[in-house]
Amino acid sequence: FLSCFKTLDEFEEEEATWIIPGWIPEGQITLMAADGGVGKTTVWCNLISAVSNGVSCILDPPGYTRKPEKVGFLTTEDSVRKKLKKKLRLAGANLKNIISPDFLKDEDGQLRDMKFGSDKMKQFISNFRLVLCVFDPVQGFVPPDINMGSRNAMRDCMAPLISLGEEYRTTFLVVCHTNKRKGAYGRD
């Protein structure tokens, strides 16, 4: 345990690199939070399309270029077959560079165990070596024993993504919904 600590002069200093310049740093966790129905899925589909196809996205500065990369998304909210494939295709995505689980093939329910910090999550990231991976929404990937209202529990839950990001250079975009309860602040 104590061997994990060192003085700052022993750390190699690195410049930040960006998947989306000024917005989404490479190998780190970025959160996207907003009310339902404002276009979170449209934004992340645009980002995935751009990265998969090597073109600029809506958040890029003018003239920004990139090379096509492998990306992935995990969603427990929208159907890949009924909504997301079409949305990505219409956004100009390179569908061969996008990985997503096929829940119809998951006859024994193994995909339900793919949570933050799980061996299955590490296996997914290490096998596909994605540049960008989207989780929509965060609730679908938090283990059931974690209290999402506890900041410390959520930090511990998501900490393995930091290690995976640095080891495999995968950037994580985690989509969060604001309170959907009717009558919550700003809803009416």
Predicted regions and their residues:
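N-terminal pre-Walker A segment at the start of P-loop NTPase domains
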Residues: F1-I19
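Conserved inter-motif catalytic segment of the P-loop NTP-binding fold
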Residues: E13-E15, I20, G36, P62-D156, ...
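Pre-Walker A (Motif I) flank of P-loop NTPase domains
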Residues: E26-T30, E69
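Phosphate-binding/switch region of NTP-binding enzymes
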Residues: L31-M32, G37, T41-T42, Y64-R66, ...
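Hydrophobic positions on the alpha1 helix immediately C-terminal to the Walker A/P-loop
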Residues: V43, L47
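Post-Walker A helix-loop "phosphate-sensing" segment adjacent to the P-loop in P-loop NTPases
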Residues: A50-P68
